[in-house]
Amino acid sequence: MFKKGDILIRNFSMGDFLIFKEYDGEDELVSYWDMAFDRPVVEQNIRSWYVDSVHLATEWELEWFFEDLKREGLRWNAKTKQVEKIPTM
């Protein structure tokens, strides 16, 4: 079972990440945010992820995820469950 804020990655993907929000029925889930390797745009509240199609990100995958966010000028705030722009000086 996934917990709110868990960072997941789609099985057999090249870097399709999502941040778990809640279950939607028995076999689907809703995410706070979604980011795919082929579109660096981060989208909010994507539906229709099948539970069987994702897994909890490994340490290596987490590093990859956070680096991708950083490259886009973003960061994950685990406390507020928001993707935020990194402030510039």
Identify what each model region corresponds to.
Residues 8:
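Short, surface-exposed loop/strand segments
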Residues 36-89:
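Intrinsically disordered, low-complexity, charged/polar segments
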Residues 11-49:
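Basic/aromatic-rich interaction segments and small domains that mediate binding to polyanionic partners
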